[in-house]
């Protein structure tokens, strides 16, 4: 009898309503934690961030140099195991020029210019700073009177890479700064074809720099403390659940407040056999420091101002953009024009005198034309006042005509 009784079913400890409330609270807590720690979390200090980035760049540079050295050693072993190549046929050269000119190596260039790599003191580059300052000042002056840079920025920001959910980007502020970069501590360093210094930490050996691809590299410190600002405004088009259901205004201002680093410049001479022109390459070493000041504003009514996470994302993106273009081992290469003197590039001398005479003749001709116009206007005014009257009084004469008989009036 006791076995036929159904066991009582245990009721759940939490009702459906309690579970729903608990789930909603957990979602709210997760959203609050995300907003507090991810969006409004305090950003690390600038010194800490710069130290972390410098360590990452240094490790990347060391790994690149290590891979270059390993590839170079493997290539040397491979060349040693191969039989010697047959001598190439010499092309016929002009007999007018000297047949065997002395080969200019890095060692001979340094000797003839009296530059001792191991003992020469770094140069201050004051004259170079003045030239660069004049160039930048002229560029800023041209930008104030011309909208070319603003038009170019607008086209670049609104190019094909702009996402669909981002509205048209408008430049709201552009400041090119007021100060100038200061270059100093310039020194000449011989490097190999891969940009590695010969015998780093050791005395310079001219025999090592005699191989093909070696070149001289100028390294100089550069420091800039300024406020170069670019501010943009746009809207985020939130197309969910339907198109243009919500719009979020966004304003962002990025300012470069300081840059310091080491600039490396070198020349790659032309190769007539391969028809390659002379090129100048420049890059920055991995010990640079680049500081930004980033301001942000989200929303139209309930505005979120200066969100730290947005500043971190933008700054990280800008550092990555700079590293991928002109920080070693990457470099920028600029093709240089021919330095041979040409008639079409000649300025000064008789040409300046001819231009001055032409401008004087134009000014003199303009003055003569102005005087002629004034004389013509004066004659026109005189003719206007000597015009005969019109109407009934055309031939009326008051009194007697000279030479007429007294008492006889002329008929009218």
Swiss-Prot record:
GO terms for molecular function: lipid binding. Keywords: Endoplasmic reticulum, Lipid transport, Lipid-binding, Membrane, Transmembrane, Transmembrane helix, Transport. The keyword Signal does not apply. Residues 121-337 form the SMP-LTD domain. Coiled coil: none annotated. Component of the ERMES/MDM complex, which serves as a molecular tether to connect the endoplasmic reticulum (ER) and mitochondria. Components of this complex are involved in the control of mitochondrial shape and protein biogenesis, and function in nonvesicular lipid trafficking between the ER and mitochondria. The MDM12-MMM1 subcomplex functions in the major beta-barrel assembly pathway that is responsible for biogenesis of all outer membrane beta-barrel proteins, and acts in a late step after the SAM complex. This is Maintenance of mitochondrial morphology protein 1. It comes from Podospora anserina (strain S / ATCC MYA-4624 / DSM 980 / FGSC 10383). The gene is MMM1.
């Amino acid at each position: 009898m006791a076995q036929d009784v159904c066991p009582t079913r245990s009721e759940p400890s939490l009702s459906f309503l309690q579970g729903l409330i608990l789930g909603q609270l957990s979602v709210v807590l997760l959203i609050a934690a995300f907003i507090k720690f991810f969006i409004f979390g305090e950003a690390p200090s600038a010194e800490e961030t710069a130290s972390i980035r410098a360590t990452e760049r240094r490790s990347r540079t060391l790994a690149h140099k290590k891979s270059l050295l390993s590839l170079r050693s493997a290539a040397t072993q491979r060349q040693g195991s191969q039989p010697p190549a047959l001598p190439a046929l010499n092309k016929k050269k002009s007999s007018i020029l000297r047949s065997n000119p002395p080969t200019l190596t890095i060692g001979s260039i340094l000797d003839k210019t009296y530059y001792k790599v191991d003992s020469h003191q770094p140069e201050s580059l004051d004259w170079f700073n003045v030239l660069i300052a004049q160039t930048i000042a002229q560029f800023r002056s041209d930008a104030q009177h011309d909208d070319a840079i603003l038009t170019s920025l607008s086209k670049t920001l609104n190019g094909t890479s702009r996402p669909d959910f981002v509205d048209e980007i408008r430049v709201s502020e552009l400041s090119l700064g007021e100060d100038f970069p200061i270059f100093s501590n310039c020194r000449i360093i011989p490097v190999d074809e891969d940009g590695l210094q010969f015998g780093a930490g050791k005395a310079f050996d001219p025999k090592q720099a005699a191989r093909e691809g070696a070149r001289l590299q100028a390294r100089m410190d550069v420091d800039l403390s300024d406020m170069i600002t670019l501010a943009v405004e746009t809207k985020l088009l939130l197309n969910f659940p339907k198109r243009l259901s919500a719009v979020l205004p966004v304003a962002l201002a990025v300012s470069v407040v300081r840059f310091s680093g080491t600039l490396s410049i070198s020349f790659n001479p032309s190769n007539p056999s391969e028809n390659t022109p002379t090129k100048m390459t420049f890059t920055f070493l991995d010990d640079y420091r680049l500081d930004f000041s980033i301001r942000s504003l989200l929303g139209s009514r309930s505005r979120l101002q200066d969100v730290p996470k947005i500043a971190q994302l933008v700054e990280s993106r800008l550092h990555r953009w700079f590293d991928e273009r002109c920080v070693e081992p990457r470099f920028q290469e600029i093709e240089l024009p021919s330095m041979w003197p040409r008639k079409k590039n000649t300025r000064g001398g008789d040409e300046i005198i001819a231009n001055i005479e032409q401008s004087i003749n134009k000014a003199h001709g303009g003055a003569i034309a102005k005087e002629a116009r004034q004389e013509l206007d004066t004659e026109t005014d005189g003719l206007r006042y000597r015009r005969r009257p019109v109407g009934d009084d055309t031939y009326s004469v008051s009194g007697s005509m000279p030479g007429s008989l007294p008492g006889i009036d002329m008929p009218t």
